[in-house]
Design a protein with these regions (language model features):
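Accessory nucleic-acid engagement/destabilization modules that flank
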Residues: 17, 24-27, 31-236
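Conserved Walker A/P-loop ATP-binding site and its immediately adjacent core
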Residues: 301-323, 336
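Conserved pre-motif I regulatory segment
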Residues: 240-276
Length: 421
C-alpha cells in the first residue's frame, strides 16, 4: 500500500508516503508564495506580467490576422514586457519612484539574439513606448537607435523564462515575389506589427486600469450599413415624377453611375481603381455604394475616406451620418476635437468617438491626407496605433490630384503596398 511504502532517502533513513506527501504539500505552498511579477497596479488590484502579456498577445494576434500575420502578433505581444521581470522594475512598481527602469530593451535583445525572423520584432518591442527607432549602426553613438539600445546593459530579467514561452513564427513577413521593393515592404511590415503591438498594449492596459471605461466598438456591421444604404437610394431609383426632362436625364445618369459602381464593387477583386465622375454626378454616394459592396464581397473591415479639405470632409461626413447612422461614422481631422476628459456618462457617444480617434475602430472613417499618411510614416506610438486598422480596408482618396507633388512618390508607394499586402 502506498500509505506504508518505504523509500530510501538522503542520510540512509526511510520516509513513509505520508512524509513525502507532506513534503510535496510544503513545496506547493512555497510555489504559491513565490513572488508575483506585476505589470500594473491600480488601487488594490494587480495585473501580473503574464496576464498582461497574454492579453496583449491575443489582441495583437487578432489585429495582425487582418493581414495574415496573427502568429507575429501573438509573439510580439508575449515578449514586449519581459523586461518587467527585473527586480528593479518590481521595486519601482511597488512604489519606489526613484528607480528608473528601461523595460523595453530586454525583449528587443531576446529577439535580436534569437536572430532570423525574430530580429524584425526588435524594432517593435524596443519602441513600444519611446517610438519606433531607426536602425543605426553597430559602431554608432546614437543611443536612441535600435543598435544603440541593444548595446545598453539591462537588469537581469531571466525570470521571464519561468512564465513566458517564446512563440513560434510560422509565416514570412511578405512574399518577396510580390514586391519589387523588399526593403520598403519590410519597413511597412514592421510598422504594421508595431501598430498591432502598441494598440493591443494600450487596450489591455486600459481594460485593467479603467474598469468602467466606455466600451469600444458596438457599431453596426457593414451588412447592416449596406441595407441602410439600399433603403436610402431606393427613393432615387424608383423616382418617376420629374419637374423637367433635364432633371429626368440627370437623375437617370446619376442612377446609372451609382448602379455601375455598386455592380463593380461586388465583382472586382481587391486592387487600385479610379472613379471619374463630372461635378454633380453623385460621386460621393456612388463611391460609398462601391465601398460597401466591395468591403462585404472582399470580407474587409471598414471604409476610410481620405479627403484634402476639411470643408469637404464636413459635407461628406454629414451625408454618411444621415445614411449610415451617427455612431458608425468617425470624422477625424484638426478641426474636430473630441474631449476624453468630459463626463462620459453625460455623452457616451462623444466619448466613444474620442476613443475611436486613437485607433480608428469604426466602420467608416472620414479623414485628411495629413492624418492618413502621418500614420503610415510617423514613428510615435500615438500616431501609429490606427495603422493596423488600415489593413483589409477600402480606402478612397477623394480629389487625389490635389496631393502635393513632393509627397506624391512616398504616398503612392504606401498606397501600393497596402493594396499588395
Amino acid at each position: 500500500k502506498l500509505g506504508s511504502a518505504r523509500f530510501a532517502g538522503d542520510g540512509g533513513y526511510f520516509q513513509t508516503w505520508n512524509n513525502i506527501r507532506n513534503s510535496l504539500q510544503r513545496r506547493n505552498e512555497l510555489k504559491g508564495d513565490r513572488m508575483k511579477y506585476l505589470a500594473h497596479i491600480e488601487g488594490e488590484r494587480e495585473q501580473t506580467i503574464k496576464e498582461h502579456s497574454i492579453g496583449t498577445a491575443e489582441l495583437a494576434a487578432m489585429f495582425a490576422k487582418a493581414f495574415g500575420k496573427d502568429d507575429w502578433g501573438y509573439c510580439v505581444g508575449m515578449l514586449h514586457d519581459i523586461g518587467k521581470y527585473s527586480e528593479r522594475f518590481q521595486k519601482k512598481i511597488q512604489g519606489d519612484n526613484n528607480i528608473k527602469v528601461d523595460h523595453s530593451t530586454a525583449g528587443a535583445k531576446v529577439c535580436y539574439e534569437m536572430g532570423g525572423l525574430y530580429g524584425i520584432l526588435s524594432y517593435c518591442i524596443a519602441g513600444h513606448h519611446a517610438g519606433l527607432p531607426n536602425t543605426g549602426t553597430i559602431s554608432g553613438l546614437d543611443r536612441s537607435s535600435l543598435f544603440g539600445r541593444l548595446k545598453k546593459g539591462v537588469d537581469d530579467f531571466s525570470r521571464y523564462k519561468d512564465e513566458i514561452n517564446i512563440p513560434c513564427l510560422k509565416t514570412f513577413p511578405f512574399n518577396p515575389q510580390k514586391t519589387v521593393t523588399p526593403d520598403f515592404s519590410l519597413s511597412v511590415f514592421i510598422r504594421m506589427m508595431y501598430s498591432c503591438l502598441v494598440d493591443a498594449d494600450y487596450l489591455d492596459t486600459e481594460a485593467f486600469m479603467k474598469e468602467n471605461q466606455a466600451v469600444r466598438g458596438e457599431y453596426d456591421s457593414l451588412k447592416v450599413l449596406a441595407e441602410r444604404f439600399d433603403n436610402h437610394i431606393k427613393q432615387w431609383l424608383e423616382k418617376t415624377d420629374f419637374k423637367s426632362d433635364k432633371q429626368k436625364i440627370l437623375c437617370s445618369i446619376r442612377n446609372q453611375v451609382l448602379q455601375d459602381c455598386m455592380s463593380k464593387g461586388s465583382e472586382l477583386p481587391p486592387g487600385i481603381y479610379t472613379l471619374t465622375v463630372p461635378t454633380g454626378g453623385g460621386k460621393t454616394t456612388a463611391s460609398l455604394g462601391f465601398a460597401l459592396r466591395h468591403a462585404i464581397q472582399s470580407k474587409m473591415k471598414r471604409i476610410i475616406y481620405v479627403i484634402p479639405y476639411t470643408s469637404i470632409i464636413d459635407q461628406n461626413a454629414e451625408v454618411f451620418r444621415s445614411i449610415l447612422g451617427e455612431k458608425n461614422v468617425l470624422e477625424h481631422h484638426s478641426g474636430i476635437l473630441y474631449d476624453l476628459t468630459e463626463d462620459k456618462a453625460e455623452n457616451e457617444a462623444a466619448y466613444r468617438k474620442a476613443l475611436a480617434t486613437e485607433n480608428w475602430d469604426m466602420p467608416v472613417i472620414v479623414t485628411t491626407a495629413v492624418q492618413f499618411f502621418e500614420s503610415l510614416y510617423a514613428n510615435r506610438s500615438s500616431k501609429c496605433r490606427k495603422l493596423h486598422n488600415m489593413a483589409n480596408s477600402v480606402i478612397i482618396f477623394d480629389e487625389a490630384q490635389t496631393m502635393p507633388i513632393p509627397y506624391l512618390e512616398p504616398c503612392v508607394a504606401a498606397i501600393a503596398e497596402l493594396a499588395a499586402h
